């Protein structure tokens, strides 16, 4: 399938269905050459790029395609194999690599795949670099090819996951263990299926694993951070202390308390922000949240004297606002949490360790830590769409939004936006009465589906 390759990058790298543009082998080879071209523009000479992936079946072909493009331009590549996205960011820094590449479509189904690119400092590349890569791919002008003796070598790094495991454990206080904790862990059959059980078990927790048998086609399938109902049931069944659900590439975290209640990213951010403030480790008493963050959570944080900077949805925007405001903690409802004291991107395993540390140090259950946070009633519905038409151009949609806003008045809010990574329109309604919020959200969903819907919403 062909597509204009002048715009490859979305809100989180390149993403799409495998074997459809832009996620084809042909375009991936060009991307590899373009990444090399950008590095060589900065300075000539030897360069090193690390390449990791999640467990999708298509990961093999994209790994080989990217490496072919990179090595053809004289770049040395290091294959990490299956490893979480934050692991690639960490290894990029640890190996003093010039760039890191993660092959993953994160929480998307197995049929999709994607490419995330990190600079040498472990942060995702910015828009200017993305645009330069796109220009090179479109023009196919990558610079001079090296002589035959100067093409790049490819090596497999055998201890990449071991290094990441040790790094993750090092974020947990020395002298403390997880002894006595029974943890239900769901790795979504994804990139954390080896490293996450090892991290928690080596810290002496009892770990009951779900989603740790990847087939290449079962990543995120009814499991992981997008399907916490799996561990809700398991926590009760196994009488566990806590449940931990990660997504396919390991940068999201959703938890479940000992009573089987879901603790989402908003709640986890509140727990960690409160702890950092108590320890005087929260600069300017500031955290970064998003427009999706529950009003009840915002009120709770403000009651603690914590300032909240609001960013658009997406970990790139959260990180940008963190850097601009010198914040060390930011996160979003979906479970992305960034601890800049530890890593340069969202890290589900490290985030879980911080929550577990707080539980242990405060001698509290997870339900104890959330008891004082009262969330506002909120409905969030994902509507599959056929195309992303500008919402302001849809008269019927704008009409129903106006009607719902009049019903809510000043006591609620509506957020309607397209996903940056999927053909989905997200409908969020928040108010004071749960039944009213659900009903109003359904009213909006019905109109959106009638206008641009592609199937059953969820």
Curated annotation (Swiss-Prot):
Location of Phosphoserine modifications: 106
GO molecular function: magnesium ion binding; phosphoglucosamine mutase activity; phosphomannomutase activity
Catalytic activity: alpha-D-glucosamine 1-phosphate = D-glucosamine 6-phosphate
CDD domains according to UniProt: GlmM
Cofactor(s) the protein needs: Mg(2+)
Annotated active site: 106 (phosphoserine intermediate)
EC number(s) given by UniProt: 5.4.2.10
Keywords: Isomerase, Magnesium, Metal-binding, Phosphoprotein
Modifications the protein undergoes after translation, according to the UniProt entry: Activated by phosphorylation.
GO cellular component: cytosol
Cofactor note: Binds 1 Mg(2+) ion per subunit.
GO biological processes: carbohydrate metabolic process; peptidoglycan biosynthetic process; UDP-N-acetylglucosamine biosynthetic process
Superkingdom of origin organism: Bacteria
Chain positions recorded as Mg(2+) binding sites: 106, 247, 249, 251
Role played: Catalyzes the conversion of glucosamine-6-phosphate to glucosamine-1-phosphate.
Family to which this protein belongs: Belongs to the phosphohexose mutase family.
Record protein name field: Phosphoglucosamine mutase
Organism: Chlamydia trachomatis serovar L2 (strain ATCC VR-902B / DSM 19102 / 434/Bu)
Gene expressing this chain: glmM
């Amino acid at each position: 399938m062909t597509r204009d390759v002048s715009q490859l990058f979305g809100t989180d790298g390149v993403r799409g269905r495998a074997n459809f543009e832009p996620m084809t082998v042909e375009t991936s080879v060009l991307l590899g050459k373009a990444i090399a071209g950008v590095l060589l523009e900065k300075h000539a000479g030897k360069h090193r790029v690390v390449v990791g992936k999640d467990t999708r079946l298509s990961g093999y072909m994209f790994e080989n395609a990217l490496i072919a493009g990179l090595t053809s331009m004289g770049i040395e590549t290091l294959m990490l194999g299956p490893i979480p996205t934050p692991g690639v960011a960490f290894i990029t820094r640890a190996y003093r690599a010039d760039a890191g590449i993660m092959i993953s479509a994160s929480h998307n189904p197995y049929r999709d795949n994607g490419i995330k690119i990190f600079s040498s400092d472990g942060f995702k590349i910015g828009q200017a670099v993305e645009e330069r890569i796109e220009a090179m791919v479109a023009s196919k002008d990558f610079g001079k090819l090296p002589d035959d003796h100067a093409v790049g070598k490819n090596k497999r790094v055998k201890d990449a996951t071991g290094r990441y495991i040790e790094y993750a454990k090092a974020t947990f206080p020395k002298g403390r263990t997880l002894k006595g904790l029974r943890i239900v862990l769901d790795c979504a059959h994804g990139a954390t299926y080896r490293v996450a059980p090892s991290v928690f078990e080596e810290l002496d927790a009892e770990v009951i694993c779900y989603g740790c048998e990847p087939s290449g086609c079962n990543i995120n399938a009814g499991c992981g951070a997008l399907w916490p109902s799996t561990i809700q049931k398991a926590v009760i069944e196994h009488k566990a202390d806590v449940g931990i659900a990660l997504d396919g590439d390991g940068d999201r975290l959703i938890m479940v308390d000992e009573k089987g209640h879901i603790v989402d990213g908003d709640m986890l951010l509140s727990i960690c922000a409160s702890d950092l403030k108590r320890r005087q480790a929260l600069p300017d008493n500031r955290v970064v949240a998003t427009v999706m963050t529950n009003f009840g959570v915002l009120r709770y944080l403000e009651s603690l004297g914590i300032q909240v900077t609001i960013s658009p949805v997406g970990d790139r925007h959260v990180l940008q606002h963190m850097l601009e405001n010198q914040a060390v903690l930011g996160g979003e409802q979906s479970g992305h949490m960034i601890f800049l004291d530890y890593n340069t991107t969202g890290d589900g395993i490290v985030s879980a360790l911080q929550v577990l540390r707080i539980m242990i140090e405060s001698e509290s259950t997870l339900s104890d830590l959330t008891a004082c946070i009262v969330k506002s009633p909120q409905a969030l519905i994902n509507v599959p769409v056929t195309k992303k038409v500008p919402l302001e151009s849809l008269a019927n949609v704008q009409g129903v939004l106006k009607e719902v806003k009049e019903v809510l008045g000043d006591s609620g809010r509506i957020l309607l936006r397209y996903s940056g990574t999927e053909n989905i329109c997200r409908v969020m309604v928040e108010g004071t009465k749960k039944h009213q919020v659900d009903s109003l959200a359904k009213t909006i969903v019905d109109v959106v589906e009638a206008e641009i819907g592609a199937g059953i919403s969820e």
